[in-house]
Amino acid sequence: MAKQKFERTKPHVNVGTIGHVDHGKTTLTAAITKVLALQGAAQFVSYDQIDNAPEERARGITIAIRHVEYQTARRHYAHVDCPGHADYIKNMITGAAQMDGAILVVSAPDGPMPQTREHVLLARQVQVPAMVVFLNKVDMMDDEELLELVELELRELLSNHGFPGDEVPIVRGSALAALSSASTDINAPEYKCILDLMNAVDEYIPTPVREIDKPFLMPIEDVFGIKGRGTVVTGRIERGKVKMGDTVEIIGMTHEAPRRTVVTGVEMFQKTLDEGIAGDNVGVLLRGIERTEVERGQVLAAPGSIKPHATFKANVYVLKKEEGGRHTPFFSGYRPQFYIRTTDVTGAIHLPEGVEMVMPGDNIEMTVELIVPVAIEEGLRFAIREGGRTVGAGVVSAIVD
C-alpha cells in the first residue's frame, strides 16, 4: 500500500508565553510539550533546551528565542518562549515571531509585577489579538481568598490595557508539578491544569484570518516601462490577491491623493498568472500609468483598504551599542530614516512629555512625523536607520494625523 500523504488539515496558530521573570514561562512551555507528548501530539522539549535558546536575527537585531511546536485535537501550534526580558521586548517589537495569541504566566504568590504590566502593554500595542492567563505556583498558596484577589487584580490590569479582562480565561495550576511528575497517565491530577490551559487556548484564541483573505496589498519594489504595454510594478504580495481587471490604488510617497488604476495583467517569472496571491513575487501591469508616476516605496492596494499618513505613534526599541546601535542618546527632534516596507523615509522624532532623552537599550513610545505620507496602519513594523545601519526597531501603535 502506498504511503499516506501528510495532510495539513488543522488550522495553524502562533502563540507565546509572556510575563515577569521567574514566574514560570519556560517551565510552563516545557510542561505543555511534556503533557501533549503523552498524547503523541508533541515532542518533549526540556527546560534547559528552552532556556539555552538559540539566537536569531530580525530586522538587524539579535534575539534569543526558542520555538516549540505541538498539536491539540483542533489545531497545530507554534509556540515561542524567550529567556530574557529584553529578548521579549525585541521579539514583540520586531515581530520576529508573530503571536496570534499570548499565554500570560503569573506567579500566584507574587501577583502581577512590573514586567507583567510591561508585557501586557506591549501585547496591546503590537496588536496581539487575545490572551489567556495561567496562574502558576498555586500549590504554594492555601488561601482561596488571596487567589481570588490576585485574579481580580489581573482582570483589572488586562481591562486597563484594552483587553476584555472579565472574559479572559484564567487557568490555575502548577507548571513545575506537571513538569516534574513521573506519571505516564494523561489523567494524572497534576496534568489537568495543562490540559485545561490548552483547552482555553483552543477555545478562546481566535483562528487568525489568513493573509490571502485580507484586502490586497503589495509594496512596490521596482518599476519598469514596457514599450507598447505600459508600466509594470514588481513586488511580493503582502496580503490578499490580485487579478486582471481589478481596480487598485497607488498609495504613499506623495502629498497628492492616491491614484486609481486598473490591473491589465499579472505575471510571475515571465509567465502570465490568472491570479497573484499573498506570498507571490509578481509583476503587475497598470493601465494609463507613466513610468515616472509610480516609485519604489509606494504600495499597490485594494481601494480604501489603507491610507497614507505622515504622523503616528510608535513603540520603539533602541539598539544598544553592543547590538550595533548608537553609542550616545538622542533627543526630541532627532531625524533618522524610517525603513517602512520597501523604502527609507526621513522623519522627526518627538519624545513624550517629561522624557528628556532616549538611551541605547531603551524601549519607548514616541511620535514620528515623516516628511512625506506613506501607507501605514496600526501594527506595521519598521526599522530606524542612520548612516546605513539599524539603530532601532518599532511598531506603529496609533495613527495621529
Curated annotation (Swiss-Prot):
Enzyme Commission number: 3.6.5.3
Please list where the region (G4) is annotated. Answer: 136-139
Chain intervals for the UniProt region annotation (G1): 19-26
Region entry G2: which residue ranges? Answer: 60-64
Q: Which residues form the tr-type G domain?
A: 10-209
Q: Which residue stretches, if any, does this entry annotate as coiled coil?
A: none
Please give the chief subcellular localization of this protein: cytoplasm
Family listed: Belongs to the TRAFAC class translation factor GTPase superfamily. Classic translation factor GTPase family. EF-Tu/EF-1A subfamily.
State what protein this is by name: Elongation factor Tu 2
> What organism does this protein naturally occur in?
Roseiflexus sp. (strain RS-1)
Question: What does the organism's lineage look like at the top?
Answer: Bacteria, Bacillati, Chloroflexota, Chloroflexia, Chloroflexales
Gene, per the UniProt record: tuf2
